[in-house]
Amino acid sequence: MGFIGSNVAVRLAAAGARVTVVDCADPGCGANLRNLAEAPEIRIIRADIRDASAVEGALRGVDVVLNIAGEISHTHSMRNPARDADLNATAQLYFLEMCGRVAPGVRVVYAGTRQIYGVPQYLPVDESHPVRPVDFNGIHKHAAVAYHQLWSDSGKIDARVLCLTNVYGPRMALNVPGQGFLGSFLRLALLGETIQVFGDGR
């Protein structure tokens, strides 16, 4: 029910897909039930992706899983690395094991982050760029990418990984701390407040 997931879910439902959303509804991660209000046909299951009883039922009969579960805050990961590891790495292990067992061979599209590459050594950053995360969020997200690749290589699932960066658009949370600088900048601009830019802004 967060920013990216809700946009994809609403578009898929409008295209005629049968959509089920599994979300723990953590407001600190951007969850907002109103994001899905325009698509009442979407089935919503409020559960953590580690909740086998909820997730296994949701996985039965699906063609594609869009896996956007996790914590995206880099600052939160540095304050509480164990929590970030639990949400972004350990939870993915549980979830992928369920996918392989309940829906063998299912296509899983994982929304990773460009943050796994760290400070760019060249632009544009591509898949050949060295992996050098600069925070725990990047480390744990990289572990999740490796889990998806391993499960896919073993034939249990058919995984695809996207490395997203600075995504913005409709339904973006502007008032959730730690959700990226774009939302913060937009909120400050709307409030007519000063936006502080460090360095030359590049």
Language-model segment annotations:
Residues M1-V167:
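N-terminal Rossmann-like NAD(P)+-binding domain of SDR-like oxidoreductases, especially those catalyzing
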